[in-house]
């Protein structure tokens, strides 16, 4: 009922039902299977809103955190709007509140709410860097160095490196290190790849061709 009301915008929306009498288990299963062919799955955004309506803690915490940065979760790209809601949930559920908080802080501080900066691959790329390097990753240096290039250039470099969010993590790490020659001042690309892949399990990269960039 909550989901129907949420999607339709009204609690007075009629819901069509059919009642079957004296069904055997096999017939019931067959009816259910056939009905699922015509069921439109809810989008991640609709599921997120339904969880908010249900008062679930994870989604309430995520919403409040996003709001605290002057951002919002939505379905259409716009400045300061995060459309990659399932990515935000995955980061929170796997890495916790403080990591998600830092990811958002770096993202907004680096690109100042650019609508292209909240893609799944960029959010996951930042998450990878934070997970691997922790406090070795200097937030102010990140914002200065990585923020010096456009999202368009970042996307281009990432695609040249490799597919998915690891390409973005590599591209951001290259910009972060800049021309530093002292190994003690550089973050190691080898370390980024040396960590067990299990640390990144649960982070789903975007496969949408237009997800990364909107603009000329």
Over which residues does each language-model region extend?
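Accessory terminal alpha-helical modules
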Residues: 2-216
